[in-house]
Amino acid sequence: MALVKGTNSYVTVAEADSYFAERLHSETWSGASPTDKEKALITATSLLDQKPWVGEAEDELQPLAFPRIGYYYDPKYGRDLDLIDTPERVVKATYELALHLLSNDVMAASSTVKSLSVGPISLQQISTSKEPSKLDELISPLLENSGSLSW
């Protein structure tokens, strides 16, 4: 299926090309074929749409998670913003995740183990991540309960 903004992607290839033209370390994007760029944007949108976003879909039949009814607090602006349009954070997350998908084998997750011991009490956290950490920063204000990401 071809990329259709608002149906299976939050952005067009042309918008992504413009975004990455101004960014360092985006050679993977500029070197990808138009078909692979479309696939990456469609897949990124699909993955992002699986998140527990705040608010509710504006129309129960809409193909994507946005637009939504509701508000979220954006620390960048220091105030609540409405969800009637796709937030800038989701658009940027779509670009960044698409680049990540082109650059990495997302099936091979990286694991991080963190542990803390105080006397007889020991805590251990194992984090498996397939997404760039930048995504958490971008979209966490829009997630229900502002939880951390997991794919």
Regions found by a protein language model. Name each.
Residues 1-151:
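Divalent metal-cofactor coordination and adjacent catalytic microenvironments
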